[in-house]
Amino acid sequence: MSELKDCPLQFHDFKSVDHLKVCPRYTAVLARSEDDGIGIEELDTLQLELETLLSSASRRLRVLEAETQILTDWQDKKGDRRFLKLGRDHELGAPPKHGKPKKQKLEGKTGHGPGPGPGRPKSKNVQPKIQEYEFTDDPIDVPRIPKNDAPNRFWASVEPYCADITSEEVRTLEELLKPPEDEAEHYKIPPLGKHYSQRWAQEDLLEEQKDGARAAAVADKKKGLIGPLTELDTKDVDALLKKSEAQHEQPEDGCPFGALTQRLLQALVEENIISPMEDSPIPDMSGKESGADGASTSPRNQNKPFSVPHTKSLESRIKEELIAQGLLESEDRPAEDSEDEVLAELRKRQAELKALSAHNRTKKHDLLRLAKEEVSRQELRQRVRMADNEVMDAFRKIMAARQKKRTPTKKEKDQAWKTLKERESILKLLDG
């Protein structure tokens, strides 16, 4: 009980910080969802509130460290007292040891040696006390308080967003405003190539020609005939390709007229809706003659290609006449193909890219303008800080003069007024 009464601890009552009253912005930010985020205008208030919380936490830590130090000092003082007590006991037990020879001399006449007996128990009693002191004198390991590095890491992460704008960042914005060299490449429309059916037909024909040449070469080797037939002539291949293209260009119905001529004739000729050609009954004829006549007049035979001269010139003349009358557009400005989905999607994305790049360029111009304005404001703020230092120097000089019980000189007063007016003028520029 006496140890508890002598305990020097103060047992401080730690008062917690009321977040709703002291830190309302911090409490509101914690109550938000993650998607809302934090605005730039809230950072200054948040900084003040977080510094308030940090100062409260550091104050509590200092009090706890002081209490821990008091406990350590108290334990050391208790150890010193025990050591002094043991020293006194040791000094009290020492005289019998020094008096042993005298007692032996006085009692030596009897020839008995019980003299040293009374001194032994004292030495035995002293030894355990020394061991006990050595046991209790072990240093107490005070646990180290872990360093709270969270505020430092927080302010280090926020620092890039609150730091002053440098000239390098302004140059970076100016470089971003320059149009890229390959910008025109993104708006080019590649030319339309051959249709896949034509390309595949040519590829199939080439493969067939190669396979045929390879098969002919193998057959000639088997027969032992090695001649000019084993190698495929490139001229023959080109001729076959041109022939296949000409056949491919010819419509399936075998009509020699062009597409424009056919469309014009279809617009001028009325369709027989009552009895179409396909539904008309075909008379049955027997015999060779009737078979020959039926074959010649059969609708199937009408689908066979027939030759009409000057079809290409007729097609071109009709096209020129329709263009001259204004019914067709000139080929110099090709009409858009509404069925080309790839081209429509490409132009749609190009329009979106143009709009987005224009929007980004506008925002970059605004950002560059704001950055230049902020740089000028930073210079004014630097001048304000310098003016503040000059005002504080003048104030210290005046206060030092008053402490020395002398009136400030006219020069000191004029200097103070001059610095104050300069500071006010800079503040007006900064606010304007």
UniProtKB/Swiss-Prot annotation:
GO terms for biological process: chromatin organization; mitotic cell cycle; negative regulation of transcription by RNA polymerase II; positive regulation of DNA-templated transcription; positive regulation of gene expression; regulation of cell cycle; regulation of cell division; regulation of DNA repair. The keyword Nucleus applies. Keywords: Acetylation, Coiled coil, Isopeptide bond, Nucleus, Phosphoprotein, Transcription, Transcription regulation, Ubl conjugation. The modification Phosphoserine is found at residues 280, 298. It is found in: Nucleus. Residues 295-305 have a biased composition (Polar residues). The modification N6-acetyllysine is found at residue 418. Belongs to the NGG1 family. The PCAF complex is composed of a number of TBP-associated factors (TAFS), such as TAF5, TAF5L, TAF6, TAF6L, TAF9, TAF10 and TAF12, PCAF, and also PCAF-associated factors (PAFs), such as TADA2L/ADA2, TADA3L/ADA3 and SPT3. Interacts directly with TADA2L and PCAF and also with the high-risk HPV oncoprotein E6. Component of the STAGA transcription coactivator-HAT complex, at least composed of SUPT3H, GCN5L2, TAF5L, TAF6L, SUPT7L, TADA3L, TAD1L, TAF10, TAF12, TRRAP and TAF9. Component of the TFTC-HAT complex. This is Transcriptional adapter 3. It comes from Mus musculus (Mouse).
